[in-house]
Regions:
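Short, surface-exposed amphipathic charged segments that create phosphate/polyanion-binding patches used
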Residues: 99-105
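Acidic-basic catalytic patches of nuclease active cores, encompassing PD-(D/E)XK
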Residues: 1-23
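Solvent-exposed, well-ordered amphipathic alpha-helical segments
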Residues: 5-9, 30-34, 78, 88
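Conserved catalytic cores of phosphodiester-cleaving nucleases, focusing on short active-site segments
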Residues: 24-55, 59-65
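Generic detector of well-ordered alpha-helical segments enriched in charged/polar residues
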Residues: 4-8, 51, 76, 93
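Short, compact, well-ordered microdomains
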Residues: 61-98
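Alpha-helix initiation/capping motif
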Residues: 19-22, 47, 72
Length: 105
């Protein structure tokens, strides 16, 4: 999945600043920037390989749609070891809200 959907959602409903990055989207909020990787359709399981790819691209977060993608235990643990957080989109939005991003709807 490209970052298109996430860009559209964040621009239309939040005060976070996003670039047009693909495959890595920079999301800036409250003086902080997270670099987000959204898995491609063939990466419907977030494994250690996907975590390594995201890290190599410079990601700090892997955010995914829980309707078609899942994170394996191995993938989450390896990502954590690499310093990359793995979360569904809903979790990413909750994280942003906890960090001070304002959402309009």
């Amino acid at each position: 999945m490209s970052t298109y959907w996430l860009i559209k959602q964040l621009r239309s409903t939040s005060d976070a600043v996003v670039d047009d990055g693909n495959p890595i989207l920079a999301v800036t909020f409250v003086g902080r920037t997270e670099r987000v990787y959204c898995p491609e359709p063939d990466e419907y399981r977030i494994t250690a390989d996907v975590a390594r790819k995201a890290k190599d691209l410079g990601a700090t977060v892997i955010a995914y749609s829980s309707s078609w993608c899942e994170a394996t235990y191995e993938g989450k643990q390896y990502a954590k070891d690499l310093g990359v957080s793995v979360m569904p989109f809903a979790g990413f939005f909750a994280y942003l809200k906890r960090k001070g991003v304002k959402f309009t709807s």
